[in-house]
A protein has these predicted regions:
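Short amphipathic beta-strand starts and helix->beta connectors
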Residues: 3-8, 72
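A structural signal for short hydrophobic beta-strand segments in well-ordered beta-sheet cores
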Residues: 10-12, 78-79
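A general boundary/transition motif marking the beginning of the first structured unit of a protein
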Residues: 26-29, 96
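Short, aliphatic-rich beta-strand segments
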Residues: 12, 18-27, 85-89, 189
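Rossmann-like S-adenosyl-L-methionine
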Residues: 33-35, 39-43, 47-208
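Extended interfacial segments that mediate partner engagement and assembly in macromolecular machines
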Residues: 1-3, 12, 17, 31
Length: 208
């Protein structure tokens, strides 16, 4: 990993049945010998079923940049969680340790104590994993996430699992939740994962 080199990182995502998505991250917009990258990875790593090239020109801790190119194979992986199937793309936020995530989600559902008619807000919902788990027991679930790509994945995941009582919005939850409150929405349950300090003050009106 060197900022001056063409390649900065190789990120791997693992789906069901051990399928792997590989994302080659470079500092510039070109991937030298792209065809060779693909052929060698396919030859040496048969579990790789999807290859992307991502461009991250900014220095810092963020691994992925906004520019992405699909080089070969599947565009998404399928990963199961809590009995639901989720499509995972390079930008998707998805729990790394699934067994532990399922235990946490079960605990969240227990605390929520849903009976079928509640309105639930899932703030910072990512790709909708918690939202869709909640939707199986709630009347209405509203997922809010600032990353547009994640919201697109969340909507696809809802359709993929035939869940119709979950809706998703690409917005800053700390700003969007007070707007919902002003419009008359009174949620029965608010879920935040992770808890955001910025949201504590901005959304005080709706969370109290």
């Amino acid at each position: 990993r060197t900022a001056g080199a063409a390649s900065r990182h190789i990120m791997g995502r693992v789906g069901d049945h051990g399928e792997v998505m590989a994302v080659i991250v470079t500092a510039s917009g070109k991937l030298p010998l792209a065809d060779l990258w693909v052929s060698e990875m396919r030859k040496l790593l048969p579990e790789v079923v999807s290859i992307y090239h991502n461009v991250q020109s900014h220095k810092g801790n963020a691994i992925l940049g906004k520019e992405i190119h699909h080089l070969w194979g599947k565009k998404t992986l399928t990963s199961s969680l809590c009995g639901l199937a989720f499509e995972v793309s390079p930008f998707s936020f998805f729990q790394v340790h699934k067994p532990q995530a399922e235990l946490l989600y079960e605990k969240a559902l227990a605390y929520a104590d849903l009976h079928g008619g509640e309105t639930v807000i899932d703030a910072y919902c990512g790709t909708g994993t918690i939202s869709l788990c909640l939707a199986q027991k709630a009347g209405r679930v509203i997922g809010i996430e600032i990353v547009k790509e994640a919201i697109e994945d969340a909507k696809k995941n809802a359709a993929f699992n035939h869940i119709e009582n979950a809706e998703f919005y690409a917005a800053d939850a700390g700003e969007f939740m007070p707007k919902l409150y002003q419009e008359g929405l009174r949620p029965d349950v608010i879920v935040m994962d992770p808890v955001r300090a910025a949201c504590t003050c901005r959304s005080a009106g709706i969370s109290q």
